A protein has these predicted regions:
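Conserved Class I S-adenosyl-L-methionine-dependent methyltransferase catalytic core
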Residues: 18-23, 29-62, 67-192
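Conserved adenosyl
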Residues: 114-303, 350-353, 360
Length: 360
């Protein structure tokens, strides 16, 4: 007869038997397991995106593992594993034996949708993933790992056009959704001309001009980036309200704008360059003008939040900058001459808040 293994009090006749000593109370190791395997979830998403799984399922009747295997050229075994993994991550749902996109994947992971996020997924997979694999090297050397400092002077002047196009397409998808939230959190009704400093693809300008019917904007960036923005502006049908201007924002800023936007820019640069840029912004603005710094802000205690803190490590492998705190930005703004400084918070992929300063 099998012996029961459940632990119970010893019978009376064995009262002198010492109980097994209790194991010391330990915290659960489950969070460590989740951290250690976090890349499993990302690579599942990246592989599904590369196989265009979500495009295959868009608006359709769904699929089975066998149908997916035949459609995209997979063996049925991994096809089933991929579908199961995506369902577990909330990217697919299964009803009546068929897998379909969830509202999340249908809105953001299908190519051609207005707020398509797949560009960022692709960039993270093809550019950032390898660099993060060398994070310890970056920590020891204080140098980036996603590009070679011996070949180029910064992330933004690389010679690989494919990687540059991938970067800006990724930034456009993240910026489009972030700009929408920024426009809801910051009141721009009383401004007429916005200068988007380092405006990239123009995503912020396009979204903000859609929200504010009287607003006009200028995307100010390097010539090859401004050309990308011009194409996006044309696609959006906003060439009558958004223009591009070429230049180096560390050297000059165009005048005749009453609000400046620095969206996901200052985290790329060190403190000295950021302070100089804010002084240049102050000088270029009229009295009553404002500057809006939109960023993933680290809290003033420098304990989180996790997206901002980890983004700061991403800046280590990519740039000379880091993610800064509201207190740091506020001090720099005050030093430059801005007043009535405030921080507003919101929830978006590329930023969690904005620090705003007014020129007296």
């Amino acid at each position: 007869m099998a012996r029961k293994l459940s632990r119970t009090a010893p019978p009376a006749k064995h009262a002198n038997v010492q109980p097994i000593s209790a194991t010391p109370e330990l915290p659960s190791a489950v969070p460590l397991m989740a951290l250690s395997t976090g890349f499993w979830a990302f690579k599942t998403l990246a592989a599904a995106h590369e196989l265009d799984l979500f495009g295959h399922l868009a608006g359709g009747p769904g699929t089975t593992a066998g149908e997916l295997a035949q459609a995209v050229g997979l063996h049925p075994r991994p096809a089933e594993m991929l579908l199961t993994g995506c369902a577990a991550l909330g990217l697919l749902e299964k009803t009546e034996g068929r897998y379909r996109n969830t509202p999340l994947s249908e809105a953001y992971l299908v190519r051609g949708k207005p707020y398509y996020f797949g560009g960022f997924v692709q960039m993270a997979d093809k550019r950032l993933y390898a660099g993060w694999g060398r994070l310890t090297e970056a920590l020891r050397t204080n140098r980036p790992t996603t590009w070679d400092p011996a070949v180029q002077s910064s992330l933004f002047d690389g010679e690989d056009p494919t990687m540059l196009a991938l970067f800006w397409e990724a930034m456009h998808s993240v910026s489009t959704m972030t700009a929408r939230k920024l426009g809801e959190a910051v009141d721009l009704r009383y401004f007429r001309r916005l200068l988007d400093i380092g405006g990239g693809s123009g995503a912020y300008d396009i979204e903000l001009c859609k929200q504010y019917g009287e607003l006009h904007a200028t995307v100010f960036d390097l010539p090859h980036v401004a050309a990308i923005a011009a194409g996006k502006i044309t696609e959006a049908g906003l060439t009558d309200r958004i223009e591009t201007a070429c230049g180096n924002f560390f050297e000059q800023l165009p005048g005749d704008h009453d609000v400046h936007l620095l969206s996901m820019i200052l985290h790329d640069w060190d403190e000295a360059k950021n302070r100089a840029l804010l002084r240049r912004s102050f000088d270029a603005l009229p009295s009553g003008g404002a500057v809006v710094i939109s960023e993933l802000l680290v809290n003033d205690e420098k304990t989180g939040p996790a997206p901002a803190a980890l983004m700061s490590l991403n800046m280590l492998i990519e740039t000379e900058g880091r993610n800064y705190t509201p207190a740091e930005y506020s001090a720099w703004l005050e030093e430059a001459g801005f007043r009535h400084i405030e921080t507003v918070w919101f929830d978006a992929p590329g930023a969690n808040g904005a620090v705003i300063g007014r020129k007296p």
